[in-house]
Structure formats: C-alpha cells, structure tokens
Amino acid sequence: MAAYHALGYQDAPFSTDSAAAIALTDPLLTGRPNHTILMSQEPYQTLTFIEWGGDVPTPFAAPGWAAMEVLVKDLDALFADLPPAFSLLNPPAALSFSEHIRAMQVAGPAGELIYFTEVSGEVPGFSLPTATQQVNQCFVMINAVTAIETSIDFYARLLGCAAPSAMPARVSILSRSNGLDEDHRHAIAPIALSPGQLFELDQWIERPAVAGQHPPCGWHSLSIRRNTPPPEGMAPAPAVITEHLHCYDIATPDGERILWLCPHH
C-alpha cells in the first residue's frame, strides 16, 4: 500500500454496499488481507488490493483485464519522481493516434500494468476527463480479447452504445511481450462506458498455456454502478443482494469479471 500512498492516494471508507465489500464475498477471497484506496471523488472510484499468493504476471499473458490507464496532471513530473516500488516499462511518449495524449507504462509492486496518462488537448471522437489531482482516476480499463469483433458487439449491447470500428494502434507492451517490433499495429477498439470513462479492447495474441500453473496475481473484477439491471440475457439472477443493491455477475466473452451494481427495483 505504501507505493500507492506515495502517489498521493488516501484510504477509502468502508461500507457494506461498497464495491469492495461486494467483490470480497467471492469465496476465493475469504479471509485474504485487503485494503481499499480512493482514486477519485467525482466520479467516485476506488481500487481494492487483495493479497494473493500467485506469481507476478507477465503483461498480456492471458485474455481478460490487462491494465488500467490512470489520469495524471503532469506526466513528466511523475516520470522524474516515480516511487521506487513502480518499475518503468516505457518512458512518456505520445500515443500513435494523438499527440494530445502521452502515456508512460509501468509495472506496480505485484506486476500490475499501469498506463499513467496525460491529456493535453481535445481528441476528436473521445470525451476525456481532466485531472483534478496529480495522480487521479482510472479512466480506461484495458481488456485483452480473443476475438475483437465479438467483444465489440458484446460490449455495445451490454452498455447500450454504438459499436465502434476497430482501429490499428501501437501497443508496445503487447508487442514486446510477444517478440514483435514495438511499432507493430494491433487492432484496438474504445467502448464508451460513461462520459470520460472507457473500456479499451485490445486484440490478444495467444501464447502456449502452461498446464497446472497456479493463477498469477492479476485483476479480480471490475465493478460498475448503473441505474438499471443489465440487458436481458447478459447475466443470471443477482449474485449478491445487499440492503440497497443488486449485484449481477456479467457473463463476458473471455471471462473478464464485471460486477454490475444497481439499486433494487
């Protein structure tokens, strides 16, 4: 936790209706030490860390949640003063499709892949947030998918948004971890979650599986709050019911876990 406190994050308050409390009802997580930080007040966003005995993962080793993109005010200042628990993978550089977005890729203490990103101007076709503190909210969750067109259709139906077209973009960590030239273009697609909040779908590159390997550290789930239940047929009956909330465990194309939280109706 010291690494994230060094970025300026504070601890989040706990409640039985919190996303963390609901996610921790998973029997796999029973009794595991955990801690939750507040990433943003508006939109309200928390990040929960759970102690897990698996190995440190290789980026993009498996399909599913692969990285979080975190908004920062001054990327060069963070680069110059990155807490030592984070390992630099790529220094600040403009994205291949916009000079107004610069990102720095790092690995966190448990190998978690983070894109620290500065937005310096408008990007046509995107509604992007403005940082309110030096290291701020996660505004993009990156999802490695085995069939990008299938996942585009799925998320457009789930979120009730227009289905984007996949576009070629440089994803240097995905290329590097698969022995490709880092200028290689991969198919990616942004999916609008809410204003200033996105999913990025990255076409995954299959790797040989290792039989019997203990699951590594990684992302357990992503919780989102909505005003209504998910579209019919996209989740079974509520998996968890609290005094005020229903929680639906969304059945996704590649098994990436989404907990859909909504009020009782």
Where are the language model's segments positioned?
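Core segments of cupin and vicinal oxygen chelate
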Residues: 1-44, 94-97, 143-196
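Vicinal oxygen chelate
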Residues: 1, 31-82, 102-107, 137-147, ...
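Surface-exposed beta-loop interaction hotspot
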Residues: 94-95, 100-154, 161-170
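Short N-terminal edge-element motif at the start of the domain
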Residues: 83-96
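A short, acidic/glycine-rich surface segment
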Residues: 19-24, 54-58, 122-127, 171-176, ...
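Generic structural signal for well-ordered beta-strand positions
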Residues: 112-114, 199, 256-259
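Short beta->alpha transition motifs characteristic of CBS
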Residues: 117-123, 203, 260-265
